[in-house]
Design a protein with these regions (language model features):
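Nucleic-acid endonuclease domains
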Residues: 1-21, 27, 32, 38-169
Length: 169
C-alpha cells in the first residue's frame, strides 16, 4: 500500500480508521492533511472531501466525522468559516506512469466540476497540475460555488422524480 511506502520513507502520521485523510504530517507546528489519488490523471475523479473543505475553510480540525448530517455540517461550516492559511492536500500518482507524481491543494485547484451524484465535486488531475494562487475569499467562493452547483444537480433529480412519481410523497 502506498501509505506504508510513504510511512517507511518519511515522517508522517497514519490516520485512524475512516479518517478524512490518508496521511498527515506536521512541519513547523502546522498540520497538513493529505489525500492520495491514484489515477490516470486524464479521467474525472470524485473528491469526497467534505471534511477537507471544512478544514480548509475554517482552519479547524473537524470535531465530527464524515457521517455528520448535511444540516449540522453546513451549520458548523457557516458558523466557523474564517480566513485562514490552512488547506487540504492531494498527492496525485499517475497509475500509468509512477514517475508522474505531483501535489495539489483544494484552495489552489484550477478546475473542479459539480457532481450531484457524488458530493461535493470532481476534478480531472491533468487540468490541475498548476496551482492557482487565490486570496482566501476567492478560494472560498470557488469551492462553495461548485459545491452549491453540485447540490443543485442533486436537488434537480429529486424534483424530476417527484414530478413523475408524486404519488410516493
Amino acid at each position: 500500500e502506498i501509505t506504508n511506502i510513504i510511512y517507511d520513507n518519511f515522517s508522517i502520521n497514519l490516520p485512524n480508521a475512516r479518517d478524512w485523510f490518508d496521511f498527515s504530517f506536521e512541519e513547523s507546528g502546522k498540520f497538513y492533511p493529505v489525500n492520495i489519488k491514484i489515477t490516470t490523471t486524464r479521467t474525472i475523479d470524485n473528491l469526497n472531501c467534505k471534511l477537507g473543505i471544512y478544514y480548509a475553510l475554517t482552519g479547524d480540525i473537524p470535531s465530527f466525522n464524515n457521517g455528520i448530517n448535511w444540516d449540522q455540517y453546513f451549520c458548523n461550516l457557516k458558523t466557523n468559516l474564517k480566513e485562514n492559511s490552512k488547506d487540504y492536500y492531494f498527492l496525485i500518482i499517475n497509475k500509468n506512469d509512477v514517475q508522474d507524481i505531483f501535489i495539489a491543494s483544494l484552495k489552489s485547484l484550477e478546475k473542479i466540476s459539480p457532481n450531484g451524484n457524488n458530493l461535493p465535486f470532481q476534478a480531472k488531475w491533468n487540468e490541475n497540475r498548476h496551482p492557482v494562487q487565490r486570496e482566501f475569499k476567492e478560494a472560498k467562493d470557488f469551492i462553495i460555488k461548485c459545491f452549491a452547483d453540485s447540490l443543485k444537480l442533486r436537488a434537480d433529480a429529486y424534483f424530476y422524480f417527484k414530478r413523475y412519481f408524486n404519488e410516493y410523497f
